[in-house]
Amino acid sequence: MTSIKKKYTYYAFGLNILSELPLPELNCPAIPDDNIDIVIKTRDLANAEIQLDEEKGFTVYRNEVVFEVSNTALFSIRNGREIIVVPLEEFDKDRVRLYVLGTCMGVLLMQQHILPLHGSAVAVDGKAYTIVGNSGAGKSTLASAFINEGYKLISDDVIPVTFSDKNIPVIQPSYPQQKLWEESLNNFGMDARAYQPLFERETKYSIPVKNSFHNQPIPLGGIFELVKGSGESVGIRKIEGLEGFRILLHHTFRGSLLQKLGLREWHFIYSSNILREVHTFQVTRSTSKFTPYDLVSKILNTMKEGNLNA
């Protein structure tokens, strides 16, 4: 007897998604009458046709990237169109969703020649502004401060950057959820008990932001790299010259795969086209006190002064 798997349709990352795996975070339905862009399938190990050469890390073939989360699942991302999930003995759907919506989507976007930046993006006065930075820099916390000031989130974690017909960089919305550490929740006066902790991260939580989510593509207005400073100082400076390329390369989601995928030249050209249209800034935050609202004010002032359109 053949079992028929239930399928779910969603719209996220600028893509119509058909999935055999429920992804409740993606509560935006697929666009009616549009073609399905990507398919997420589950397969048992015997029928998956997956070859994993590297015990740790990624196995990269011409049109396929494979990796394993130990004892949980095998993942195969193929041709920018398909994600295969193979459950293993300790399969956990919550943990697997983190990888599907993170690493798998980041790789799939690169296979489609769409730049995935690692950070958060917010909508301000009809433009998208990305906040990129290393892990722990405070990207989601700064984005949350923007939300609390009445602005809307476009993406958190994986930021898809595409181009319009007029070659203007555009940010595609991901899905209405943030990930915040308990320390940030406390600083914002939010009760951690009201939110779901992320798998294996007991002090990091999933924060739904459906009412503060911008669900349409929006032109990119600027890029802000968030870094930790020394002491209480906060500041912002405009990035000049080749440093903009360094920022885009360093903060590409799973950028370590660019070489194996043969995409270094593509990435350079793509970055050139972005930097030709928008300015990049570095924002320094305090490490001794909670300053996201100060940073929001400085960033908004930079926008109003016209420095992003010079």
Each predicted region: which residue ranges?
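Glycine-rich, often acidic-flanked micro-motifs
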Residues: 2-22, 26-28, 125, 129-132, ...
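Long, basic/Gly/Ser/Thr-rich N-terminal segments
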Residues: 1-92, 96, 297-310
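Phosphate-binding P-loop
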Residues: 112-126
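Walker A (P-loop) phosphate-binding loop of P-loop NTPases
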Residues: 136
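Aromatic pocket-lining residues of Rossmann-like dinucleotide-binding sites
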Residues: 146
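N-terminal pre-Walker A segment at the start of P-loop NTPase domains
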Residues: 97-115
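Post-Walker A alpha-helix
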Residues: 142-143
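Conserved lysine of the Walker
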Residues: 139
